[in-house]
């Protein structure tokens, strides 16, 4: 068995997702963390922020050329939307076979990139070095819709609620705990980037209404699905069980899942499966941790896949 190690760098390591990535890398037997880039923490020891990581590695403030000059096997870009392109260009120029996993939305609509939602798109992976990690809401939406895709009679309506960690670390109303107290904040109620993302990936128009809640982490996604023919609940449940059979990170549950039960866990739960009278409308609920299956854990699945390592290495399941 080949047990060679691979070198990895993380750009955007200060954020919530970067922190989860560092934990996963620290537990990975075949990844060596070569650098972590964070403008705000430059010079600080990684171990002082992440006790699970041993060693003297320090945060650096690296621009695109400096990242490319490191010559690592793989780079994870955990940056806000719109910032990935210079890093991608520099890495392509310096070492074209570098595996790049981008967590932003920047390349989710680029057919030259593999769209990495492994449970749904694993069959499309064909050695691509550039991987676009799906959005957190987008992952939950697709898991709720996919098993019924051929039965849809119209656009799925998806009501999403996320913990405020999804708003990142840059201060805003959507991560202000005082403003969020006893509150629910609707935002981007049409044309959210994840609405567009899922519409492209599923090949069907999706209507998505996101909200931010006072809890820190975890997404609840409630999908209202109109069907083109009558179904029983048993038929619906069987479709989901068949779709996710053999997928350790996707759990099909009978009752509607609670976000409090998925926070801190690396997979997703899908359940509820409530049919309206007449059998042509069903409501499905999906929950996942937006920082894990919605970001870091999924990125690790994709990185493992690209490096030829067992997909779930370092991911508790």
Curated annotation (Swiss-Prot):
It comes from Stenotrophomonas maltophilia (strain R551-3). The active site is at 136. Gene3D superfamilies: Dihydrodipicolinate Reductase, domain 2 (3.30.360.10), NAD(P)-binding Rossmann-like Domain (3.40.50.720). Pathway: Amino-acid biosynthesis; L-arginine biosynthesis; N(2)-acetyl-L-ornithine from L-glutamate: step 3/4. It holds the Pfam family Semialdhyde_dhC_1. It comes from the Bacteria. CDD domains: AGPR_C_ARG5_6_like, AGPR_N_ARG5_6_like. It is an enzyme of class 1 (oxidoreductase). This is N-acetyl-gamma-glutamyl-phosphate reductase. Catalyzes the NADPH-dependent reduction of N-acetyl-5-glutamyl phosphate to yield N-acetyl-L-glutamate 5-semialdehyde. It catalyses: N-acetyl-L-glutamate 5-semialdehyde + phosphate + NADP(+) = N-acetyl-L-glutamyl 5-phosphate + NADPH + H(+). Belongs to the NAGSA dehydrogenase family. Type 1 subfamily. GO terms for cellular component: cytoplasm. PANTHER family: N-ACETYL-GAMMA-GLUTAMYL-PHOSPHATE REDUCTASE, CHLOROPLASTIC-RELATED, N-ACETYL-GAMMA-GLUTAMYL-PHOSPHATE REDUCTASE, CHLOROPLASTIC-RELATED-RELATED. InterPro entries: AGPR_AS, AGPR_type-1, NAD(P)-bd_dom_sf, NAGSA_dehydrogenase, Semialdehyde_DH_NAD-bd. GO terms for biological process: L-arginine biosynthetic process. The lineage of its organism: Bacteria, Pseudomonadati, Pseudomonadota, Gammaproteobacteria, Lysobacterales. It is found in: Cytoplasm. Its EC number is 1.2.1.38. GO terms for molecular function: N-acetyl-gamma-glutamyl-phosphate reductase activity; NAD binding; NADP+ binding. Keywords: Amino-acid biosynthesis, Arginine biosynthesis, Cytoplasm, NADP, Oxidoreductase.
């Amino acid at each position: 068995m080949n047990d060679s190690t691979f070198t990895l760098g993380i750009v955007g390591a200060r954020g919530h997702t970067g922190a989860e990535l560092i934990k996963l890398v620290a537990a990975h037997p075949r990844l060596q963390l070569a650098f972590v880039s964070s403008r705000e923490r430059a010079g600080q020891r990684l171990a002082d922020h992440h006790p699970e990581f041993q060693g003297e590695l320090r945060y650096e403030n690296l621009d695109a050329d400096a990242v490319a000059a490191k010559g690592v096997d793989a780079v994870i870009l955990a940056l806000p939307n719109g910032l990935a392109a210079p890093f991608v260009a520099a890495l392509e120029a310096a070492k074209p076979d570098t595996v790049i996993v981008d967590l932003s939305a920047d390349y989710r609509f680029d057919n030259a990139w593999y769209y990495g939602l492994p449970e749904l798109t694993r069959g499309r992976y064909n050695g691509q070095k550039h991987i676009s990690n799906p959005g957190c809401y987008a992952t939950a939406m697709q898991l709720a819709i996919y098993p019924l895709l051929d039965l849809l009679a119209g656009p799925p309506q998806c009501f999403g609620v996320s913990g405020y960690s999804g708003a990142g670390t840059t201060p805003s109303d959507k991560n202000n705990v005082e403003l969020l107290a006893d509150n629910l904040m609707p935002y981007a109620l049409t044309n959210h980037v994840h609405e567009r993302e899922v519409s492209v990936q599923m090949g069907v128009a999706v209507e998505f209404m996101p909200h931010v809640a006072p809890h820190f982490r975890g997404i609840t996604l409630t999908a209202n699905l109109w069907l083109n023919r009558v179904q029983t609940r048993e038929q619906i449940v069987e479709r989901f069980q068949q779709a996710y059979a053999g997928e350790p990170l996707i759990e099909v549950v009978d009752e509607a899942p609670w976000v409090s039960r998925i926070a801190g866990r690396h997979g997703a739960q899908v359940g509820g499966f409530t049919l309206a009278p007449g059998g042509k409308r069903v409501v499905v609920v999906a929950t996942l941790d937006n920082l894990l299956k919605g970001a870091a854990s999924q990125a690790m699945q994709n990185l493992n896949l690209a490096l030829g390592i067992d997909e779930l290495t370092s991911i508790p399941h």
